[in-house]
């Protein structure tokens, strides 16, 4: 019985001791500049730009006992304040609208994932993924 109590105290001590180290290694939820691809059906090229997106660590808890009567809500790093910008894709055919609107993160927050504005899947595509030919904003092909 004493061994179990001492083991629990040691585990608790290590958690308290290592928590500041763990927190300092993880980036907080904040806007970061990221390579993002912009493409549209009907246009043959994918434009690659740098834009602020929300990224970082949000504290979450996974309950040990999962009750069928309670719901677990996981918080993710997502947009708090956002501005939308428009850019023109090159080489689009004359009958298609070459303009694409994309979000620019002004501030971020740890909150529930909004399926209307965010990709809430576990294994999503990277922000710079392109289906069509990639073109950098300075005109160089990838």
Curated annotation (Swiss-Prot):
Transmembrane segments: none
Disulphide-bridged cysteine pairs: 29-77, 43-92, 46-130, 54-108, 58-110, 113-120
Function, as annotated: Involved in gametogenesis and steroidogenesis.
Signal peptide: 1-23
One BP term from GO: androstenedione secretion
Major localization listed first in the record, in broad terms: secreted
Protein name: Gonadotropin subunit beta-2
Keywords associated with the record: Disulfide bond, Glycoprotein, Hormone, Secreted, Signal
Subcellular location per the Swiss-Prot or TrEMBL entry: Secreted
GO molecular function annotation: hormone activity
Organism: Oncorhynchus tshawytscha (Chinook salmon)
InterPro entries: Cystine-knot_cytokine, Glyco_hormone_CN, Gonadotropin_bsu, Gonadotropin_bsu_CS
């Amino acid at each position: 019985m004493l061994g179990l109590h001492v083991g629990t105290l040691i585990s608790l001590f290590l958690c308290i001791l290592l928590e500041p180290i763990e927190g300092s290694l993880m980036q907080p939820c904040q806007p970061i500049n990221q390579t993002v691809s912009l493409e549209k059906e009907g246009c043959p090229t994918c434009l690659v730009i740098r834009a602020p997106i929300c990224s970082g660590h949000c504290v979450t808890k996974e309950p040990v006992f999962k009750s069928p009567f309670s719901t677990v809500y996981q918080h993710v790093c997502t947009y708090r304040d956002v501005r939308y910008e428009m850019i023109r894709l090159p080489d689009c055919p004359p009958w298609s609208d070459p303009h694409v609107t994309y979000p620019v993160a002004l501030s971020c927050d740890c909150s529930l994932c909004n399926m209307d504005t965010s990709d809430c899947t576990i294994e999503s595509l990277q922000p710079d993924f392109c289906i069509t030919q990639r073109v950098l904003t300075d005109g160089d092909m990838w």
